[in-house]
Curated annotation (Swiss-Prot):
Protein name: Hemagglutinin-esterase
Cellular-component GO terms for this entry: host cell plasma membrane; membrane; viral envelope; virion membrane
Gene field: HE
Protein's cellular compartments: Virion membrane; Host cell membrane
Listed GO MF terms: host cell surface receptor binding; sialate 4-O-acetylesterase activity; sialate 9-O-acetylesterase activity; sialate O-acetylesterase activity
Chain's role: Structural protein that makes short spikes at the surface of the virus. Contains receptor binding and receptor-destroying activities. Mediates de-O-acetylation of N-acetyl-4-O-acetylneuraminic acid, which is probably the receptor determinant recognized by the virus on the surface of erythrocytes and susceptible cells. This receptor-destroying activity is important for virus release as it probably helps preventing self-aggregation and ensures the efficient spread of the progeny virus from cell to cell.
Keyword list, A-Z: Disulfide bond, Glycoprotein, Hemagglutinin, Host cell membrane, Host membrane, Hydrolase, Membrane, Signal, Transmembrane, Transmembrane helix, Viral envelope protein, Virion
Family that this chain belongs to: Belongs to the influenza type C/coronaviruses hemagglutinin-esterase family.
Length: 424
């Protein structure tokens, strides 16, 4: 009887030998309620236009092309569409959201608003933008773009002040100076309206430095005032630098309502597009796949900076991106990461996706879903069995009862047999 607990424990450990359930470096989903946002590496429609049609252009398995769970556009990104005239209406909905885009706005594009501007500021903007997107898509099912209507009572029109190469900023819009103003020391306003969504991500941006125009330096100052609630959001230029600064953006999450955009100095800016967030859901971390070029082009790590637990899991390849279609399309490592979309998985964690929910040699960090448990028994290669102990306890009791019955029966027959021999 005293050997029984040891027997059960040894059997349990032996049963776990040879079984391993490590976290895998993939993105996956618990069930069919998922959605992917991407670019050319997951744009099935773009592949249709290649001649000849060649699915090696993508990192996405072509079996997913007809799933209806992908919103991707070659040459674009959510950040690029949010700020610039190069626009694609990313739209999708799901409990589990995956992002594999961002590479189409990197240091390789070298965007800056003016010739003396700074691309570093735009990389900072990119990181702040995706932080808001990832955080909010952990609690919202639906993402799309909406236009933001505004009313400006002056005669001046919006101006393309901020542009570089093929990229022209149109969100926020700049309202040009009125002809009767001799300089930029003036206050001006415009009404804008947010309606139809649960919440919105909108930009509030300023030139954070001394802006030079006709020998005069100006400090940018921009505010949004919610006329329904009385809440005001604002930014004022605080830097004294005259070169090397650019358009610093904050990304506000605002409710529906009537707003007033206010400029106290320099040009008035007003949002023209917003990320529309709809359908609140239970907290579900998003998954982000690193979006970068082959090393021949300069990339950034802003999506990694923006993707932090517990609201986001980041997946990356350990090697340089080397495509088979061309060096920037069809990489084996990233194809492997996306292959997890072909099947359901029970558990997600910071380390990766677990294929089974029973036992693992690795403790899941920031776990989500039905996750395995594990323990260290000072033998790194031997995971302890951590199944539900109740069945083992019951089995032990039954075995103990069986042993007692067998012993009693043996004693009974031995005594009975001895009595018979004595009587004979």
């Amino acid at each position: 009887m005293f050997l029984l607990p040891r027997f059960v424990l040894v059997s349990c450990i032996i049963g776990s030998l040879g079984f391993d359930n490590p976290p895998t470096n993939v993105v996956s989903h618990l069930n069919g309620d998922w959605f992917l946002f991407g670019d050319s590496r997951s744009d099935c429609n773009h592949v249709v236009t290649t001649n000849p049609r060649n699915y090696s252009y993508m990192d996405l398995n072509p079996a997913l092309c007809g799933s209806g769970k992908i919103s991707s556009k070659a040459g674009n990104s959510i950040f690029r569409s949010f700020h610039f005239t190069d626009f694609y209406n990313y739209t999708g909905e799901g409990q589990q959201i995956i992002f594999y885009e961002g590479v189409n706005f990197t240091p390789y594009h070298a965007f800056k608003c003016t010739t003396s501007g700074s691309n570093d500021i735009w990389m900072q903007n990119k990181g702040l933008f995706y932080t808001q997107v990832y955080k909010n898509m952990a609690v919202y099912r639906s993402l799309t773009f909406v236009n933001v209507p505004y009313v400006y009572n002056g005669s001046a029109q919006s101006t393309a002040l901020c542009k570089s190469g093929s990229l022209v900023l149109n969100n926020p819009a700049y309202i040009a100076r009125e002809a009767n103003f001799g300089d930029y020391y003036y206050k001006v306003e415009a009404d804008f309206y947010l309606s139809g969504c649960d919440e919105y991500i909108v930009p509030l941006c300023i030139f954070n430095g001394k802006f030079l125009s006709n020998t005069k330096y100006y400090d940018d100052s921009q505010y949004y005032f919610n006329k329904d609630t009385g809440v005001i959001y604002g930014l004022n230029s605080t830097e004294t630098i005259t070169t090397g600064f650019d358009f610093n953006c904050h990304y506000l999450v605002l409710p529906s309502g009537n707003y007033l955009a206010i400029s106290n100095e320099l040009l008035l800016t007003v949002p023209t597009k917003a990320i529309c967030l709809n359908k609140r859901k239970d907290f579900t971390p998003v998954q982000v796949v690193d979006s970068r070029w082959n090393n021949a082009r300069q990339s950034d790590n802003m999506t990694a900076v923006a993707c932090q637990p517990p609201y986001c899991y980041f997946r990356n390849s350990t090697t340089n991106y080397v495509g088979v279609y061309d060096i920037n399309h069809g990489d084996a490592g990233f194809t492997s990461i996306l292959s997890g979309l072909l099947y359901d998985s029970p558990c997600f964690s910071q380390q990766g996706v677990f294929r089974y929910d029973n036992v693992s040699s690795v403790w899941p960090l920031y776990p989500y879903g039905r996750c395995p448990t594990a323990a260290d028994i000072n033998t790194p290669d031997v995971p302890i069995c951590v199944y539900d102990p109740l069945p083992i306890i019951l089995l032990g009791i039954l075995l103990g009862v069986a042993v007692i019955i067998i012993v009693v029966l043996l004693l009974y027959f031995m005594v009975d047999n001895g009595t018979r021999l004595h009587d004979a």
